[in-house]
Amino acid sequence: MSDGGSNKEMLASMSPDELRGAMRTLGYRTQSELANAIGVSRSAVSLWLEGKVGVPRPVAMLLRMLISAQRRIY
């Protein structure tokens, strides 16, 4: 059962490098652009990118869904 929990953690979490990649894929060039798009402060995005604070699960899931939808469209 612990493997299931680990898999869920892996799917939900997002490293700073993954966040940078998601920003690039979705066309967000700045922290402010991403922050405005998802309704958070620029400083929150900055903390995530610096690895000082983890990317919240809902944000990671949202970004992954947006990437998935974008790939289906294009």
Residue ranges and their predicted role:
Residues 2-27, 64:
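A short, Lys/Arg-rich alpha-helix, primarily the initiator
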Residues 33-35:
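Short alpha-helical "recognition helix" segments of helix-turn-helix
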Residues 1-6, 70-74:
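Short intrinsically disordered terminal tails
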Residues 30-31, 42:
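Helix-turn-helix DNA-binding elements, focusing on the entry/boundary residues of the two helices
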Residues 39-54:
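Recognition helix of helix-turn-helix/homeodomain-like DNA-binding domains
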Residues 57-74:
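DNA major-groove recognition helix of helix-turn-helix/homeodomain DNA-binding modules
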